[in-house]
Structures are given as C-alpha cells and as structure tokens.
Amino acid sequence: MADAAMSGEEKEEDGGKRTTAATPAETLGFYEPSDGSRVETKKRSLSDLSLLRFISAELTRGYFLENNEAKYKERREKVYTCLRIPRELEKLMVFGFFLCLDAFLYVFTLLPLRVLLALIRFLTLPCCGLSDGRVLQPAQVCDVLKGVILVICYFIMHYVDYSMMYHLIRGQSVIKLYIIYNMLEVADRLFSSFGQDILDALYWTATEPKERKRAHLGVIPHFFMAVLYVILHAILILVQATTLNVAFNSHNKSLLTIMMSNNFVEIKGSVFKKFEKNNLFQMSNSDIKERFTNYVLLLIVCLRNMEQFSWNPDHLWVLFPDVCMVIASEIAVDVVKHAFITKFNDITADVYSEYRASLAFELVSSRQKNACTDYSDSVSRRMGFIPLPLAVLLIRVVTSSVKVQGILAYSCVVLFYFGLITLKVLNSIVLLGKSCQYIKDANMEEKLFQPPTCQPGKTPKKAQNKSKPNQGHPPDETANTSVTSQPTKAASTAQLLVESNSDKLLTTPDAEEKDISGDNSELKQKQADKDLLDIDRFTICGNRID
C-alpha cells in the first residue's frame, strides 16, 4: 500500500511537471516562467533593441485619424474659411469703395447744383413768398454751408506753397520721414473722428428751431470751427501726399519700401487681439476708408509728377510699377490680417456678407424720402470718411496742375463735369440695385418699413427707461408709423436720436427678441445698446434736421 501511495505521488509529481512544462506554451505566459525562459526572453528583448528594428518600426507604424474625426473636420473648415476670406473681403471692400466714391462724387457734382437751387429759392423769395414759414429748408441750409466751406477753404489753400513743402520734406532723413508719416496717419484718424462731430454741430446749430432756448455758441463760431477743421485736415492730407511723392521720387526707393513695411506692422498690432463680430465690422469700415484715401493720394502724386514732366506719357509708365506695388501691399496686408483674425476668433467668412447687407441697408434707408441724415454724412459716420477736406485738396491740386486756356479747354471742362455727373448717377443706380439685392438675400426687406426707435431730447438709455411700461409688447408691434411717412410737427421740433436698424441686425436677432419677455427683454436691449457703441465708429445716432 505504501509502495502504491508513493507511486501515486510520483505520478502526481510527474503529471504536475508535465502540466507545468506545458503551461507556458498553452497559457501564453500567464504563469511565472522558469529561469531558463527568463534568460531567453531577455536575450530576445536585447536583440529587439537594434537600430534597424527601431527604424523599421518607425517606418511601418500606423495610426487612425478617424478616432479624432471632429477635430480634423474643424481644422479643415478653418482652412476653407481662410481660402474664402480674400474673395468675401474684396467683395465688401469693392462695395465700400463705391460707397465712398459716391459720397466723394456728390461733392463735385450734385452739391453745386443743390447750392444753386437753394440760391435761386432765396433770390426768388420776394416773388414766391414763404410757403411753410422758412426761407430755406434745413437740407438746403446744410448744402449752402457745405458749399461756402468748400469755396473758402479752396481759396485759403492757395496760400499753401506746395513746392516749398516738397523741398522741405525732401531734405529730411529717411528715418525722420518714416516717423513723420506714422504721425500723420495717427493725426488723420484723430481729425476724422472729431471732424464729423464739428460739422454735425454746425448743421444742427444752423437749423435748430428758433423757439427753442439755445444753449450753444452760435452759428458763426461753429462755422469758423468747421472752416478751421477742413483747412487743417486738408493740409494734413497734403503733407501725406507730399511725403508719398518724395518716396516715389527717391533714387533707391528705400523710403517707399519702409513706408510699405509699415503696413505689415499693422498685422502685428491687430492679429493677436480678441475680436468680436462688431469690432471686426468697425475695422473693416476703417480699412475701406483707408484704401479709398490711399487711392486719392496716389492720384494726387501722379498728377504732381506728370505736371513736373510736362505731361509726358512715358513718365506715367515709370510711376506705374510703384503705384501697383503700393496697392498690392495694401491688399495683401488686409487679406492676411482678416484671414488670421477670423481664424483666431472662430469667425466664419459669411460675416462679410452680413457687413455688406448692413451697409446696403444704411444706403437704402438714407435714400428714403424723410431720411434722418444726408447720405454722405451717413457714410462719414460709419466709415470715418469725410469728403470735404479731400475734395478741397483735390480741387487745389487739379487747378494748379492743369492749365485751362481757350474756349476749347473750357468746353472740355464742361464735358468733363457732365461726365462726372453721369458717373455719379450711374454709380448711385448700380449701388441701389446691388443694395436691394443684398437686403433681399439677407431677408431684411420688412425692416425697411419699421420706424426707428426715437425719443426726443433723450439719450438712448433714458429713453429706454421711460418706455419700461411697454415691455410686454414685442418689438415689432410697437411700430405705428412707417419710415417713409411724414413726421409730426411735434417730432420735427425736437432733436431725435435715431438708432440704426442695420446696427440692430448685427446684435440682436428677431427670433430671440420675440421669445424673451419682461426683465430678459430689458437685459437684451441694454446689451444691444452697448454693442451699438462698438459698431458705429463715431456715433450710433443720426441727428434729424427738420
């Protein structure tokens, strides 16, 4: 029995050894291997760390992009957005350029005719009498003031010696001229921001109702301030044009290169800042104004250079490469700047269509029968483009560069004037057609017939607090008159601060306004008013002049 038990134990030990030996092959190493297998595995791992095997692993290593599909789709959309930015931006720039051109041509074409009609009305007043108790309509008073300012500033500009200014600037060093040009750009923006306020103050002071108690300096002081502003701004632009002319005529073109490199510094100052849609709209309007002003400066430089070379057409081809280089650098800087701003702030390229629709809405609204402000003043407030100083300078340069002698020359001047009128009319018609198309594409037709939110003699915040009992009504139901309807006499005797409907389109959607109620609607309205201050460059309101 003992032998049998011993033999059973030996069998069990043999079986255990057999199972233990077979376990590593069957269980793939779930049990601890023996010492021999450890040594063999270590030798195999050391042999796996060879350089060739590492290179082979790097060359054959795979990965699966579909595991992070959402991230890669987002990156692809950003690339597509950057590719769409140049096209959408240039559409906005072209539309804005023709808006500025329309306001600029108005000074040369329709403004003299409107002043002439106002003078005819004034001279025929004893025969016709006063139909509505006024000598001139408010719009006619503003036109006469613009015409008088234009004529006075033109004659004062004759005392500015362009040749002396050119040689004075040419004698300076390159670095000093670069600093001067940068200072002139900053001063131009400051003048533009304050100049329209001076002109608006003059227009309202001259047309304010007589029965109201006047708390201002009077028309004459405001008029002299406006003349002084236009003169200083015109001289500032003349110095800019002279500096650019010196850069064009320099032998090594180093100054022109430095001035163009200044545009690329603008990328550094704006790309890495946080931008909202409203801030980007403000910057886009500033870029439109800057590009149009640069084109007029280039025109002035070409006129002065062609006069110095006795209008030799061969010299025009000498200037052509430099002009193209300046324009190309300006376009490249704008494209790169807007592309990276939209990329870093997650703004789609469709936002430029909204900007274009907003400008179109302002254009169509300002063409209404009873608009709150003149169209050229609306462009000035929106883009910071004031055409009067630039028009004074261009007239001064053209009259000094082109000599008109003889009947044939005067006939050419008359034909040229009629050509400008034709261009102005065609440009206005095309702009109105395009604007209506943009408004239709943006589904904004019904907003053209909504009245502006106005309160006489109140700021927007005070007017909002006064209208708190009517918060239960939707915004669309508070409308009781049309934009094209005739205003009442009581409303015409007060200064109305008008909130632009196009600004509201970029801040508060209609669907959200109809759903919210009570305190939420008040909070939304306050937020919209805060955003409007960011959208408009100088003021969110147009003063109604009646």
Swiss-Prot record:
Keyword list (alphabetical) reads: Cell projection, Chondrogenesis, Cilium, Cilium biogenesis/degradation, Cytoplasm, Cytoskeleton, Developmental protein, Differentiation, Membrane, Osteogenesis, Transmembrane, Transmembrane helix
Q: Which Pfam families match?
A: DUF747
Q: Where in or outside the cell?
A: Cytoplasm, Cytoskeleton, Microtubule organizing center, Centrosome; Cytoplasm, Cytoskeleton, Cilium basal body; Membrane
Q: Which GO terms describe its cellular component?
A: centrosome; ciliary basal body; endoplasmic reticulum membrane
Residue segments, region Disordered: 1-37, 449-529
Q: What is this protein called?
A: Transmembrane anterior posterior transformation protein 1 homolog
Q: InterPro entries annotated for this entry? A: Tatp1
Where do Polar residues bias regions lie? Answer: 478-505
Q: Which residue stretches does the UniProt record annotate as biased composition, category Basic and acidic residues?
A: 514-529
Source organism lineage? Eukaryota, Metazoa, Chordata, Craniata, Vertebrata
As for what it does, the entry says: Plays a role in primary cilia formation. Involved in cartilage and bone development. May play a role in the differentiation of cranial neural crest cells. May act as a downstream effector of hoxc8 during development.
Instruction: State the species of origin.
Output: Xenopus laevis (African clawed frog)
One BP annotation, GO: positive regulation of bone development
Family as reported in the entry's similarity comment? Belongs to the TAPT1 family.
Q: Which residues cross the membrane?
A: 92-112, 149-169, 219-239, 316-336, 384-404, 413-433
Kindly indicate whether the keyword Ribosomal protein belongs to this entry: no
| Predominant location category | cytoplasm
The topology of this chain with respect to the membrane is: Multi-pass membrane protein
